[in-house]
Curated annotation (Swiss-Prot):
Ca(2+) binds at residues 786, 789, 791, 915-916. The active site is at 235 (proton donor). Disruption phenotype: Decreased virulence in a mouse model of invasive infection. It is an enzyme of class 3 (hydrolase). One of its GO terms (biological process) is carbohydrate metabolic process. Its EC number is 3.2.1.96. The record marks 445-446 as: Cleavage. The lineage of its organism: Bacteria, Bacillati, Bacillota, Bacilli, Lactobacillales. A glycoprotein binds at residues 151, 153, 186, 237, 303, 305, 349-350, 356, 402. The keyword Metal-binding applies. This is Endo-beta-N-acetylglucosaminidase EndoS.
Length: 995
């Protein structure tokens, strides 16, 4: 149980030899001198050593040795401790030799179940010296189906265990209450405070060791006191640890041991009469044991104490509650059935403080300061839990309470919650009559959802048995079940009652040869999609405590082998598909009505193929006419296409504007794949006939069918990666565009991408600065890296470059390339409402590799954060403008090492905020070498006195060929490399001639 109040006792291991010495093991007439932690202690004759006490457990021996260690030289205290140990050993002997009564056979468990965790240290037999303990576990009433032994503080030699085994268990079993032992998760793993699992020599982490540990756990915690099962508490406070650190290997081992326990007891165990239970605070996706452990458990108990347990936690980003009760169940429903699922609340623990105050039961009334009792459940969270049922799957198994020995005690009032020293009347110990538990059990017993399914629900016995086997035994299961129901017993003669299903996901009717008619009188209520009418009884974050009703999808219907079926009526269900109808096996069909749906029956569709098969069967039996076959008044639903046919658009340069959406994004498709691009297409579709009759409703107009693209957005990117969201494109300049369309539902993933070419096509540039390495500069290095992450980021991202108005970044590009353009964005590009000052001046520079050593730069780049080491290739000045971005052309630069300087011209708090910097061009291996080849060619062409005019003309032609390919609209690396190679060869020949 997730209880902050409980502090688990950790016992240190103290070596017996250093504590007591060998002298304590002997019995001399005179006083013995004993060494305990290097201190001399005198002990009277006749007192035994701790290790000589044969019945005490090793854990209890450790405790007594620790007490002796602390006692030091206080002879009287040592004597008292040893006497206490001797008495403990006698009690342990009594426990070891007690006779366990014969087990009383128990009836099968049926919901609605009520469980309660009884704290052993509050049983009056736990420690007779504590006179304030007035409750006994054996007094739990018959309304408690599951009594959990929540053990802490009670010694393993306490006579409570004898009382439990010889009196409590037989008495509780006789009234129908099962008694379950709870152990922490870590007991299955070894490591810190892991009980018998600490003995790694006896229980090593091996397959055989895990089997042995599982058996020892069941023997110790179930069979030893003749209990009815085992409960493993899976939560963060009980996670396996080694040296106080969470142990991943221990978690994995605990799963294996859990499985081994499940092979001994529980639904898959050798002994199925003993229950195997898991309780947890985790959501399913955070519970490491649930996936592999679920098949082995009878029940799952989930602790949902307090307001957040009921309502979930509010998530401000998504603006909705998370970890709600329904979400918690949905997660676990993948692994267990609803009748296995129980939810829990907590009674008020005495002296509980902030962090352990749940307010699940009623508080003490202000005027009732002397009385700490309040047994009224009206309006409590506990009562709401008793009434709550999952919206899907079926009815829950029941509820449980923690600290049931506090049943009836009022909760401490909220106004005292933070007064740590305050002691309220509710902190007193009271004898309980379990009025609250009884009342909560009564609430569940009155819940009609738990009524058993009977012949009134399903008159056909074979059908009833099939439903109860697959769905559940309770009436409330019928309206909640959202799985698959397969009916394949040929003995089924009637399907009456299936209309009680409201959320069925799939209905399989297979080989039911005695069924002659299928229509809405027997088919599930959700043959037609609808809204969930089940309302929550829980408190929610909504002001009116009402949730928006969820949509219930239509049931998927599979019909095959109904050879006796004569009449099939699926009219008026708003269904879009006939898939699932094995029409060829419906060999006796005489009448079919599929009118009033949303079916596309166009030629070539799956719907049409199925319908034609049924039509043929009916024609062969009774003939096809308007009385035997109805298929009219269809209103097919229009859907957005998955893909769009038009992926490119070529336009001439002209002084015009083009609507991109109307040119590139259009069309509506049925779920059968029939594409309709225009109203003319729709009219032709609407006029299509089957046997002289139209299937599309004549009053179903195109505007009702077509989908709307009105709220779709567009992102238009030009060849320099400049973007706009304007759906209208001007064609007044030669350019190539990438056009992305986005749906209102998802603004991040394009539903369609197309290329638009105005004039001659251009190759799209690449941002060569994306992923660049920041190697120096004055800017904050963490935020400087964000400048090159390829995205503007969100409005809340911190991308300030530092505590000064002027900041620099030195960076290296990832790959060689030919740089033709650059762009940077002001903060207003990502946040129009920003108060950050825009960049007023900027300079873009490349490293002066001609005059300075690159290796020195790389060894200590911050020393090179000076203008003299850099060559400025472009500058920017705002001149009073507040632009969101600046971009400009560059002239075929090939440097990989760059420096950029941004200046807001403000005070030291007006730091530059630059979401993104782009260095634009084309990847080109050996770009620097290629450009040097061009430079060399230009230099040689000036040496007219050394070469003939013919040679100079040839050199010029090859130089121009390379420059043309470098500046071509279509950037062709192959052509560039070929021209560079030719020019290089030409240069080398001229240089040889020169020599």
């Amino acid at each position: 149980m997730d209880k902050h109040l409980l502090v688990k006792r950790t016992l240190g291991c103290v070596c017996a030899a250093t504590l007591m010495g060998a002298a304590l093991a002997t019995h001399h007439d005179s006083l013995n001198t004993v060494k305990a932690e290097e201190k001399t202690v005198q002990v009277q004759k006749g007192l035994p050593s701790i290790d000589s006490l044969h019945y005490l457990s090793e854990n209890s021996k450790k405790e007594f040795k620790e007490e002796l260690s602390k006692a030091g030289q206080e002879s009287q205290k040592v004597k008292e401790i040893l006497a206490k140990a001797q008495q403990a050993d006698k009690q342990a002997q009594e426990l070891a030799k007690m006779k366990i009564p014969e087990k009383i056979p128990m009836k099968p468990l049926h919901g609605s179940l009520y469980g309660g965790y009884f704290r052993t240290w509050h049983d009056k037999t736990s420690d007779p010296t504590e006179k304030d303990k007035v409750n006994s576990m054996g007094e739990l009433p018959k309304e408690v189906d599951l009594a959990f032994i929540f053990h802490d503080w009670t010694k393993d030699y306490s006579l409570f265990w004898k009382e439990l085994a010889t009196k409590h268990v037989p008495k509780l079993n006789k009234q129908g209450t099962r008694v379950i032992r709870t152990i922490p998760w870590r007991f299955l793993a070894g490591g810190d405070n892991s009980g018998i699992a600490e003995d790694t020599s006896k229980y090593p982490n091996t397959p055989e060791g895990n089997k042995a540990l599982a058996k020892a756990i069941v023997d110790e915690y179930v069979y030893k006191y003749n209990l009815d099962g085992l409960d493993v508490d899976v939560e963060h406070d009980s996670i396996p640890k080694v040296d106080k650190k969470e142990d991943t290997a221990g978690v994995e081992r605990s799963i294996q041991v859990f499985e081994e326990i499940g092979k001994l007891i529980g639904p898959k165990g050798v002994d199925k009469s003993r229950l195997f239970i898991m309780d947890s605070t985790y959501m399913a996706d955070k519970n490491p044991l649930i996936e592999r452990g679920a098949p082995y458990i009878n029940l799952l108990l989930v602790q949902v104490y307090g307001s957040q347990g009921e309502k979930g936690g509010w998530e401000p980003v998504s603006n909705r509650p998370e970890k709600t009760m329904e979400e918690r169940w949905q997660g676990y429903s993948k692994y267990i059935r609803p009748e296995q699922y129980m939810i829990g609340f907590s009674f008020y623990e005495e002296n509980a403080q902030e962090g352990n105050l749940w307010y699940d039961i009623n508080s003490r009334k202000d005027e009732d300061k002397a009385n700490g009792i309040n047994t009224d459940i009206t309006g409590t969270r506990a009562e709401r839990y008793a009434r709550w049922q999952p919206k899907t799957g079926g009815v829950k198994g029941g509820i449980f309470s923690y600290a049931i020995d506090r049943d009836g005690v009022a909760h401490q009032p909220k106004k005292y919650a933070k007064q740590k020293e305050f002691k309220d009347a509710t902190d007193n110990i009271f004898h309980s009559d379990y009025s609250v538990s009884k009342a909560l059990k009564t609430v569940m017993l009155k819940d009609k959802s738990y009524d058993l399914i009977d012949e009134k629900d399903f008159p056909d016995k074979a059908l009833r048995e099939a439903v109860m086997a697959q769905v559940g035994t309770r009436k409330g299961d019928l309206e909640r079940f959202n799985g698959t129901l397969r009916l394949d017993n040929p003995a089924i003669q009637s399907l009456e009652g299936l209309n009680k299903f409201k959320k069925l996901a799939q209905l399989d009717l297979i080989g039911l040869s005695r069924i002659t008619k299928l229509d809405r009188s027997v088919l599930p209520a959700n043959m037609k999609p609808g809204k969930d009418t089940l309302e929550t009884v829980l408190e929610t974050y909504k002001k009116d405590n009402k949730e928006e009703p969820a949509t219930i999808p239509p049931v998927s219907l599979k019909v095959s082998g109904l050879t006796g079926l004569k009449e099939l009526d699926l009219s008026g269900f708003d269904r879009e598909t006939l898939a699932g109808l094995d029409a060829a096996t419906l060999t006796s069909l005489e009448k079919v009505d599929i009118s009033g749906n949303k079916l596309d029956l166009a030629p070539g569709t799956e719907n049409r193929q199925i319908f034609d098969t049924m039509l043929s069967t009916i024609s062969n039996h009774v003939g096809s006419n308007e009385q035997t076959v109805k298929f009219d008044k269809q209103k097919p639903t229009g859907h957005y296409p998955d893909t769009y046919g038009k992926t490119s658009l070529r336009l001439p340069v002209a002084n015009e504007k083009v609507d991109l959406q109307s040119q590139l994004l259009f069309g509506t498709v049925t779920n059968q794949g029939t594409l309709i691009n225009s109203e003319a297409d729709y009219k032709a579709y609407q006029n299509h006939k089957i046997a002289g009759r139209s299937f599309v409703d004549s009053n179903y107009h195109y505007n009702n069918f077509k989908v709307s693209y009105e709220n779709y957005t567009v992102k238009v990117t030009d060849s320099t990666l400049g973007t706009t969201t304007d759906k209208t494109l001007a064609t007044d300049k030669e350019e190539t565009y990438k056009v992305d369309f986005f749906s209102p539902a998802d603004k991040t993933k394009a539903v369609h991408t197309a290329k638009v070419i105005v004039g001659d096509e251009k190759t799209m540039m690449v941002n060569l600065a994306e992923g660049a390495t920041v190697i120096g500069g004055s800017a904050d290095p963490v935020n400087a890296r964000k400048v090159f992450d390829g995205q503007l980021g969100s409005e809340t991202d911190n991308i300030s470059l530092g505590w000064d108005s002027k900041q620099s970044i030195i960076f290296k590009l990832k790959e060689d390339g030919l740089i033709k353009h650059w762009r940077f964005f002001n903060d207003s590009a990502r946040n129009p409402e920003t108060t950050n000052k825009p960049i007023q001046e900027a300079s873009l520079q490349i490293f002066n590799i001609k005059d300075y050593n690159l290796d020195n730069l790389l060894e200590n780049p911050n020393k090179f954060d000076d203008e003299k080491y850099w060559i400025t290739v472009d500058t920017y000045s705002a001149q009073g403008e507040r632009a969101t971005a600046f971009s400009n052309t560059l002239n075929n630069i090939t440097s990989k090492y760059w420096r950029v300087v941004f200046d807001t011209k403000g005070d030291r708090y007006s730091s530059p905020v630059v979401p993104e910097l782009q260095i634009l061009g084309y990847p080109l291996p050996n770009a620097d070498t290629i450009m040097k080849t061009v430079t060399t060619a230009k230099e040689l062409s000036q040496q007219k006195d050394k070469f003939s005019q013919k040679m100079l003309d040839e050199l010029k032609i090859k130089e121009m060929a390379l420059e043309t390919s470098l500046n071509s609209k279509i950037f062709d690396v192959t052509a560039i490399n070929a021209n560079a190679g030719v020019l290089k060869d030409c240069i080398e020949k001229r240089q040889l001639l020169k020599k």
